[in-house]
């Protein structure tokens, strides 16, 4: 009896099947797609499938991102305007410090004063999405040069920067909200989008306690930061 109990306590249960089948061949990919469509794959399995896809397509995703980045730097009125205004403040944003990379976290991009701008190539849906993302991060770069933003310790600074970037980049215009995020409201949709995205960004910062704290900080700076459209005369798009 003691032996049986000991043997049972040392045994391990088999890993739970999440529905994902490892493999990069076409047949396995099709099987995984079918499992996802028919509900035979858990959320964990879907995430594994997504990560495997991103790794598999990394080279192509980054090349497409770089080509679209270079096109936007040359031909996009919005991106060129922001680039010129950053240069007037003594900064320089170009293809040499805008990096296309595969990101592990579900985010579109990021700005670091010492590094530059990172675009998450595996999250870009199309060139329009990349333009919105690049504009968002370039507005952060502009704010860093003009207002000396304390990104690490001052949540009010971070909240204001996120409000301005979401407000001015074009990512909250109605068409983008409707087709990409399933937001159907007409009235006040722009303000609600800006507020929602600012709260999510502030909430992700280490100094923020929770969603309530993030909401409070965003509300404290909302009026002045939402009205501030520099370097534009008004909301561009």
Swiss-Prot record:
Sequence positions that bind a divalent metal cation: 136, 140
Region (Disordered): 1-20
Gene Ontology BP, a term: mitochondrial protein processing
Xref: InterPro entries: Peptidase_M76_ATP23
Active-site residues, as the UniProt record annotates them: 137
GO molecular function: metal ion binding; metalloendopeptidase activity
Polar residues composition bias: residue spans: 1-15
Enzyme class, broadest EC rank: hydrolase
Enzyme Commission numbers on file: 3.4.24.-
Any one annotated GO CC term: mitochondrial inner membrane
Location of the protein in the cell: Mitochondrion inner membrane
Topology relative to the membrane: Peripheral membrane protein
The entry's keywords: Hydrolase, Membrane, Metal-binding, Metalloprotease, Mitochondrion, Mitochondrion inner membrane, Protease
Protein purpose: Has a dual role in the assembly of mitochondrial ATPase. Acts as a protease that removes N-terminal residues of mitochondrial ATPase CF(0) subunit 6 at the intermembrane space side. Also involved in the correct assembly of the membrane-embedded ATPase CF(0) particle, probably mediating association of subunit 6 with the subunit 9 ring.
Family: Belongs to the peptidase M76 family.
Protein name: Mitochondrial inner membrane protease ATP23
Organism: Coccidioides immitis (strain RS)
């Amino acid at each position: 009896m003691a032996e049986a109990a000991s043997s049972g306590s040392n045994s391990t249960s088999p890993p739970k099947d999440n529905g994902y089948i490892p493999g990069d061949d076409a047949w396995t990919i099709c099987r995984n797609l079918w499992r996802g469509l028919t509900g035979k794959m858990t959320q964990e399995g879907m995430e594994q499938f997504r990560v495997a896809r991103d790794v598999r397509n990394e080279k192509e995703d980054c090349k497409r991102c770089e080509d679209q980045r270079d096109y936007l730097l040359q031909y996009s009125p919005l991106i060129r305007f922001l680039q010129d205004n950053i240069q007037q403040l003594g900064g320089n944003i170009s293809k040499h410090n805008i990096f296309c990379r595969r990101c592990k976290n579900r985010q579109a991009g990021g700005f670091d004063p010492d590094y530059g701008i990172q675009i998450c190539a595996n999250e870009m849906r199309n060139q329009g999405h990349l333009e919105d993302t690049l504009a968002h991060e370039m507005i952060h770069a502009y704010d860093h040069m003009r207002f000396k933003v304390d990104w690490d310790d001052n949540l009010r600074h971070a909240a204001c920067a996120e409000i301005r970037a979401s407000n001015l980049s074009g990512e909250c215009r109605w068409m983008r909200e409707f087709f990409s995020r399933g937001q159907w409201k007409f009235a006040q949709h722009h303000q609600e989008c800006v507020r929602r995205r600012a709260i999510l960004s502030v909430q992700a910062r280490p100094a923020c306690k929770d969603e309530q704290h993030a909401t409070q900080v965003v509300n404290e700076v909302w009026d002045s930061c939402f009205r501030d459209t520099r370097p534009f005369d008004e909301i561009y798009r």
